[in-house]
Amino acid sequence: MSGKSTLQPKTIFPNLPAIAGVRLAAIAAGVRYTGRDDLLLVEFAQGTRVAGVLTRSQTPGAPVKWCRKLLPKGQARGLVVNSGNANVFTGRSGEVVVSRTAKAAAEIDPHSRSLY
């Protein structure tokens, strides 16, 4: 697979100012591409309110199911975004990966039950 997405913007994004209550980190984890950032972790301040819009697919992947379960709570401490596609048939193995990812990300706040 090529290291460059056809959807990649032609221009460089400007440096953005810090957003109070939000911390971002991105790494090249090898999820989808080699040598470029493909995993994002967002940490939100305690008490952050959230909402979401998810696929209407009748066959959503495990990450979408996870978010559907958590979104009604309306709060989040963290968000994990990868460059893969959530509308996939991953079955039980996908659910295990989502759960493990959330547990790893929960090191932000080990008592949190609000990591998307």
For each of these PLM feature ranges, what is it?
Residues 1-55:
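N-terminal amphipathic/basic leader segments beginning at the initiator methionine
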Residues 35-38, 59-61, 73-78, 110-114:
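Short coil/turn connectors at secondary-structure junctions
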Residues 1-7, 108, 112-116:
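Molybdopterin (Moco) oxidoreductase catalytic core of the xanthine/aldehyde oxidoreductase family
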Residues 42-76:
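Active-site-flanking structural segment that lines cofactor/substrate pockets
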